[in-house]
Amino acid sequence: MDTDFEPLAPSLENIIDQETLKWVFVGGKGGVGKTTCSCSLAVQLAKVRESVLIISTDPAHNISDAFDQKFTKVPTKVNGFNNLFAMEIDPNVGLNELPDEYFEGENSAMKLSKGVFQEIIGALPGIDEAMSYAEVMKLVKAMNFSVVVFDTAPTGHTLRLLSFPQVVEKGLGKLLMLKMKLAPFISQMGSLFGMQDFNADTLTGKLEEMLTIIRQVNEQFRNPDQTTFVCVCIAEFLSLYETERLVQELTKCGIDTHNIIVNQLLFRREGQAPCAMCSARYKVQGKYLDQIADLYEDFYVVKLPLLDKEVRGVENVKKFSEYLIKPYCPNGTNETQEQDK
């Protein structure tokens, strides 16, 4: 490590202070506490932003458990906040799970097009999931939140989400090639139902509309002024390996990432002798913290404690969120506590 390099603050205050940020992703290996961290970050952002939305794209939907409040596909205000909203979506479901109003248009053709649309795109691998995501993003953009926090699914799902624009573009190309072959059949079906304005252009127009949305969002995702990705891990080999893979993939995708949260750490307390198990775990964690310091010297690295109780409920999330800004100290002061090497 370069001894002349001044370590960055062990805090996510850089995210809170970046007023241009529009999209914040929080992700990592399963079981490292991503949801607690994403909810805590959303709470801190709600202090300085006009309106904040946290979206769970993890099928487990743990933000309902974290805030101890049931959330749905519709943005719902978090209890105790006027400007913090939450919603849960499943990126693995397709268009059949979306509300009918997503397909409403000025003419009756669009009301019929949902079912036909599903049948046509169903044969295109991966596009159903991508289109569902596009419709959700369309809804989110229309609501115009100041900042959106994504509590993402485990790493593999997250990387697939970032590849959606390419999936849709590939699918669009296939669909456009089929357009001429399908056009007579679709026109006949429209005539059968008495809707002359229902044709191939209606269907491809819907797909192109969503592709435009995905391209716009994708462009914003690759703008470091508007988007950043926070990696969450624990001080263990597999988690650190997964984090490095995630950082490399994000870099390859052009997604900014310069913050890492190391969660579930043991801290020594003055005047208390640790048990043999805690001492052993403390030593292992110290080894991987050294590796993190070497690998990510140009990252903001936040160290969060393993607590003796669950972080559940709004008040507990609020308290825990303070550790993202002010480093945790087991002895009750605000000074940064480093693990013994």
UniProtKB/Swiss-Prot annotation:
<dbReference type="GO" id="GO:0016887">
    <property type="term" value="F:ATP hydrolysis activity"/>
</dbReference>
<feature type="binding site">
    <location>
        <position position="263"/>
    </location>
    <ligand>
        <name>ATP</name>
    </ligand>
</feature>
<dbReference type="GO" id="GO:0005524">
    <property type="term" value="F:ATP binding"/>
</dbReference>
<keyword id="KW-0479">Metal-binding</keyword>
<dbReference type="InterPro" id="IPR016300">
    <property type="entry name" value="ATPase_ArsA/GET3"/>
</dbReference>
<feature type="binding site">
    <location>
        <position position="275"/>
    </location>
    <ligand>
        <name>Zn(2+)</name>
    </ligand>
</feature>
<comment type="function">
    <text>ATPase required for the post-translational delivery of tail-anchored (TA) proteins to the endoplasmic reticulum. Recognizes and selectively binds the transmembrane domain of TA proteins in the cytosol. This complex then targets to the endoplasmic reticulum by membrane-bound receptors, where the tail-anchored protein is released for insertion. This process is regulated by ATP binding and hydrolysis. ATP binding drives the homodimer towards the closed dimer state, facilitating recognition of newly synthesized TA membrane proteins. ATP hydrolysis is required for insertion.</text>
</comment>
<dbReference type="Pfam" id="PF02374">
    <property type="entry name" value="ArsA_ATPase"/>
</dbReference>
<dbReference type="InterPro" id="IPR027542">
    <property type="entry name" value="ATPase_ArsA/GET3_euk"/>
</dbReference>
<comment type="similarity">
    <text>Belongs to the arsA ATPase family.</text>
</comment>
<keyword id="KW-0547">Nucleotide-binding</keyword>
<keyword id="KW-0813">Transport</keyword>
<dbReference type="InterPro" id="IPR025723">
    <property type="entry name" value="Anion-transp_ATPase-like_dom"/>
</dbReference>
<keyword id="KW-0378">Hydrolase</keyword>
<comment type="subunit">
    <text>Homodimer.</text>
</comment>
<feature type="binding site">
    <location>
        <begin position="29"/>
        <end position="36"/>
    </location>
    <ligand>
        <name>ATP</name>
    </ligand>
</feature>
<keyword id="KW-0963">Cytoplasm</keyword>
<protein>
    <recommendedName>
        <fullName>ATPase ASNA1 homolog</fullName>
        <ecNumber>3.6.-.-</ecNumber>
    </recommendedName>
</protein>
<feature type="binding site">
    <location>
        <position position="278"/>
    </location>
    <ligand>
        <name>Zn(2+)</name>
    </ligand>
</feature>
<dbReference type="InterPro" id="IPR027417">
    <property type="entry name" value="P-loop_NTPase"/>
</dbReference>
<dbReference type="GO" id="GO:0046872">
    <property type="term" value="F:metal ion binding"/>
</dbReference>
<dbReference type="GO" id="GO:0071816">
    <property type="term" value="P:tail-anchored membrane protein insertion into ER membrane"/>
</dbReference>
<keyword id="KW-0862">Zinc</keyword>
<feature type="active site">
    <location>
        <position position="58"/>
    </location>
</feature>
<dbReference type="GO" id="GO:0043529">
    <property type="term" value="C:GET complex"/>
</dbReference>
<keyword id="KW-0067">ATP-binding</keyword>
<keyword id="KW-0256">Endoplasmic reticulum</keyword>
<feature type="binding site">
    <location>
        <position position="236"/>
    </location>
    <ligand>
        <name>ATP</name>
    </ligand>
</feature>
